[in-house]
Amino acid sequence: MSQSTSVLRRNGFTFKQFFVAHDRCAMKVGTDGILLGAWAPVAGVKRCLDIGAGSGLLALMLAQRTSDSVIIDAVELESEAAAQAQENINQSPWAERINVHTADIQQWLTQQTVRFDLIISNPPYYQQGVECATPQREQARYTTTLDHPSLLTCAAECITEEGFFCVVLPEQVGNGFTELALSMGWHLRLRTDVAENEARLPHRVLLAFSPQAGECFSDRLVIRGPDQNYSEAYTALTQAFYLFM
């Protein structure tokens, strides 16, 4: 689906090469997921895992960015979201490369022997607090179903020695997540702090961890320039996806 032939549709988000319906998912397509899907390092990967796939956004973005030989497994606990992810993937150019699994990631991994070069997750980060409108949204927002230590343990169980585990989190939560990951034997290899504009402090952080030690590359990404248009850096990162960029 090219930019010129794409048609804007309701109840979802239209990208240059695919459409993501999200009306049956607790968490909608947003900047966090788009950032993560565009940013995660994909060079040389052969097998990818999306933990908490939701609408299938990250799996679809990885499919667009990788070669036809790369297989992507997308695991989602909530049945309605998993069904919608499957529908989105079936309508995409990469249906044969993405496998959707309706499952608890911890239970699913006990049945797997394959290891992944890239693991990606846009995880819950709220502690239990204000009640959500639906159980599905609570599951997507809060760490009660899969807390951060469990998420890091799951990733460690199935990642290759040189693989990357990538997440996007609020800045302060990301700092705590990093401390936890380091204490569990992970090594931080990539970090991008994301700010809305030059005048704002970073509000999100993109993190890539690996079992293998090495230099950590850190940078800063500003989403909008002084004119409130998308910055050159944000445009370069995401223009393969946004319809009118």
Curated annotation (Swiss-Prot):
One annotated GO biological process: methylation
Gene3D superfamilies: Vaccinia Virus protein VP39
Main location: cytoplasm
Enzyme Commission numbers on file: 2.1.1.223
Recorded catalytic activity of this chain's protein: adenosine(37) in tRNA1(Val) + S-adenosyl-L-methionine = N(6)-methyladenosine(37) in tRNA1(Val) + S-adenosyl-L-homocysteine + H(+)
GO cellular component: cytoplasm
Subcellular location: Cytoplasm
Entry similarity comment: Belongs to the methyltransferase superfamily. tRNA (adenine-N(6)-)-methyltransferase family.
Biological function: Specifically methylates the adenine in position 37 of tRNA(1)(Val) (anticodon cmo5UAC).
Protein name: tRNA1(Val) (adenine(37)-N6)-methyltransferase
Gene name linked to the record: yfiC
